[in-house]
Amino acid sequence: MSGKQDLSPLGLYSSYDPTKGLISYTSLYGSGTTVTFEELQIFVNKKITQGILFGTRIGAAGLAIIVLWMVSKNRKTPIFIINQISLFLILLHSSLFLRYLLGDYASVVFNFTLFSQSISRNDVHVYGATNMIQVLLVAAVEISLIFQVRVIFKGDSYKGVGRILTSISAVLGFTTVVMYFITAVKSMTSVYSDLTKTSDRYFFNIASILLSSSVNFMTLLLTVKLILAVRSRRFLGLKQFDSFHVLLIMSFQTLIFPSILFILAYALNPNQGTDTLTSIATLLVTLSLPLSSMWATSANNSSHPSSINTQFRQRNYDDVSFKTGITSFYSESSKPSSKYRHTNNLYDLYPVSRTSNSRCNGYPNDGSKLAPNPNCVGHNGSTMSVNDKNGAHATCVQNNVTLNTDSTLNYSNVDTQDTSKILMTT
């Protein structure tokens, strides 16, 4: 007998595929259970991919929380709080999922043998908590999307459209959250009753489709706002967004990338690992919420185009003084009074016509309406009266406040003790 162990002759054949080799072991179904090396490798690769993905989610969400906290000037607005909650929930959900991956419930031993002796109640509780945190995460994302729709169409001239679109978003978001909740409850019920039972993916697929529909709907609205902003600025003769700025808005502030990933997740073959695209898309949605919120709340009637609003509050006008020389249709005091009633066309999506008879009126604190000054006349025949926020020191000097043919206002020598406010009413 040779001292060397005999080698398999299969090693000499280049056509032999070792991944097709069989592993025989004892499982819940008996001692004759077999599995190929390929199936085992696919399972291990899937778990490694999930670990990398959810580890990346933890790092990205944690960094986004810190950066958003540093750059935001107003941290008390609802949309900032909602976005911070969304980022925190994705961090918590990813942490729990990593705990699930490291537990016995996601181990190779249990998934291939189905022997549940090694599964503790703690592993089951982590599984249930992960599912419920995912429901809360989806709810926070939907609330942020609904709030952005409401902010975009909050102007007086667009309340009808805003109510309809906000209602559609609310119904779609509520349905999505309910479906995720049903999916989580059914999964937890099946696991608590029988650890070896496989959960039904029917409701999960419906919930994922509804979430992708919400993101696609919001992407469309933010894109429409960009188109109308470009149209409005061209009409007003203001400086346009350059090509890089438009590309930046489309890439990061309209949720276009997660929208594409949601579509690819269902268009491609799931056996090729495309199911992870849903997790990546959810991460990109959550990370994009602060940027899309900045775009949703930004105004587009200033002389210099900007898509960044770190105040995270609705901006319908420019916070500039008459002394700066930078003007637009809207100008307010840097310390606006809460008693003012703002009447305006949100974001100037459809600007005032050049041929319309517009009148510019001031409103003092007592709510009464001041008569327009007949000595102040614009080029299109409109009459104007300029008032400061106290409503008592306003004077309009003839030919010093004019409405130009390019529909922008020029201010000079306006007698006021504070930064004045002009409201356009038709």
Curated annotation (Swiss-Prot):
GO molecular function: mating-type factor pheromone receptor activity
Function of the molecule: Receptor for the peptide pheromone alpha factor, the mating factor of yeast.
Homology family: Belongs to the G-protein coupled receptor 4 family.
Bilayer topology term: Multi-pass membrane protein
Phylogenetic classification of the source organism: Eukaryota, Fungi, Dikarya, Ascomycota, Saccharomycotina
Gene3D superfamilies in the cross-refs: Pheromone alpha factor receptor (1.10.287.920)
Gene: STE2
Transmembrane segments: 50-72, 79-101, 131-153, 160-182, 202-224, 245-267, 277-299
GO biological process: pheromone-dependent signal transduction involved in conjugation with cellular fusion
Major location (coarse): membrane
Keywords associated with the record: G-protein coupled receptor, Membrane, Pheromone response, Receptor, Transducer, Transmembrane, Transmembrane helix
Location(s) in or outside the cell: Membrane
Organism for this UniProt entry: Lachancea kluyveri
Domain of life: Eukaryota
Database matches in PANTHER family: PHEROMONE ALPHA FACTOR RECEPTOR
Protein name as catalogued: Pheromone alpha factor receptor
Annotated Gene Ontology cellular component terms: G protein-coupled receptor homodimeric complex
